[in-house]
Amino acid sequence: MACVSYPYEAPVSQTLFERAAAVTPGGVNSPVRAFRAVGGTPRFMVSGNGPYLTDADGRTYVDLVCSWGPMILGHSHPEVIAAVQEAVARGTSFGTPGEGEVALAEEIVARVEPVEQVRLVSSGTEATMSAIRLARGFTRRAKVIKFAGCYHGHVDSLLAAAGSGLATFALPDTPGVTGAQAGDTIVLPYNDLDAVREAFRAHPGEIACVITEASPGNMGVVPPAPGFNQGLKDACAENGALYISDEVMTGFRTSKAGWYGVDGVRPDLMTFGKVMGGGFPAAAFGGRRDVMAHLAPAGPVYQAGTLSGNPVATAAGLAQLRLLDDAAYAKVDAVSAEIRTLVTDALTKEGVAHRLQNASNMFSVFFTDRPVNNYEDAKGQESFRFTAFFHSLLAQGVYLPPSSFESWFVSTAHDEQAVQRIADALPAAARAAAEATA
């Protein structure tokens, strides 16, 4: 790891981290939050307002994580908060159907044309796990194609060569996943259609589905090559498999219809999360009516959840989606473009080799002079420069994802003042990256 000095301490966060470590493995409830990839003390946040987070030590940061994507309207949006307060006042969970879940499902179906029916769940992991089970039940096949660097939640069969936290910690897979569980997963290089076609030739009549992030953000942002997603769809159609587009990250962030609204490739099944929950645990999977008809109680493929369609989560999600009109997306896209230009200009001025890649308003920086088209390319970056860059920005009150393998996110709340604060911090951060050593 790079030799990095931390310009200030975070004593309250450090105390909380030590308390957490005594009762929680690694002191966190999701590994990348632990700052292991960058070093230092994880910041324990106590509040968020608009584009800002405030930590337990009283320091305020411009937030470029946005809770890993969901907070596209910024923190504590008054209309979302009001919807949540009204829902909580009526009760927090009923264990029955409710109008809120119907309204949220209707909103998703109205926005995303390939989704004819949708099932609500509580996490992106549940959504992808359930979509895979449904694809297997529908096709009566077992094997699944996924791509190295694409992360689809912590599902046993999908953790092979996954991105996100596994990439952050340089883990090829994880203990606890048996050979039998992983044996039906075929892992291929991302953006390689020839490898996909060869896999179908090698396993005729065995592959249930191909699952891919619609535009990956869990190995850093690595967009699909032109024609790649359509090629996946075509290969699936030719071989009787289902094409599953994982839009947990891109869904309702990259456009009103997610990445489908960008590339127009029609999946058989799709998964959603993050933005659709408005900051609450909510996710969904949906797609073709004839496929969804195989789900219980309509069909034989079982899936269930005590808190699926939770009334508070659906109220938050519905409020957020209804606020995401064309003007909101134009705002997020414009802010993202402005920040991307600032980052590139600062790094270029200091002579730092880098590739800034984006998928709509999602983006990340790779510290390399080579194109990044797949997971192997992403792993070739000089991560020690990111560490120095990260800590310089953190010290100046700009909060990035604590990993070079994660997307950055912005919101409609990132105003001129927030952007200026980022602009003011970037020159020193770029110098820190330039001067960093492995």
Swiss-Prot record:
NCBIfam families: hemL (TIGR00713), PRK00062.1 (NF000818)
Entry annotated with the keyword Cytoplasm: yes
Family assignment from sequence similarity: Belongs to the class-III pyridoxal-phosphate-dependent aminotransferase family. HemL subfamily.
GO molecular function per UniProt: glutamate-1-semialdehyde 2,1-aminomutase activity; pyridoxal phosphate binding; transaminase activity
N6-(pyridoxal phosphate)lysine PTM positions: K274
Assembly behavior: Homodimer.
Cofactors: pyridoxal 5'-phosphate
Reaction equations catalysed: (S)-4-amino-5-oxopentanoate = 5-aminolevulinate
GO biological process, one term: protoporphyrinogen IX biosynthetic process
Localization in the cell: Cytoplasm
E.C. code: 5.4.3.8
Protein name in the entry: Glutamate-1-semialdehyde 2,1-aminomutase
Coiled coil location: none
HAMAP family tied to this protein: HemL_aminotrans_3
Key words of the record: Cytoplasm, Isomerase, Porphyrin biosynthesis, Pyridoxal phosphate
Domain of life: Bacteria
The organism of origin for this protein: Streptomyces avermitilis (strain ATCC 31267 / DSM 46492 / JCM 5070 / NBRC 14893 / NCIMB 12804 / NRRL 8165 / MA-4680)
Gene Ontology cellular component terms for the protein in this record: cytoplasm
Pathway: Porphyrin-containing compound metabolism; protoporphyrin-IX biosynthesis; 5-aminolevulinate from L-glutamyl-tRNA(Glu): step 2/2
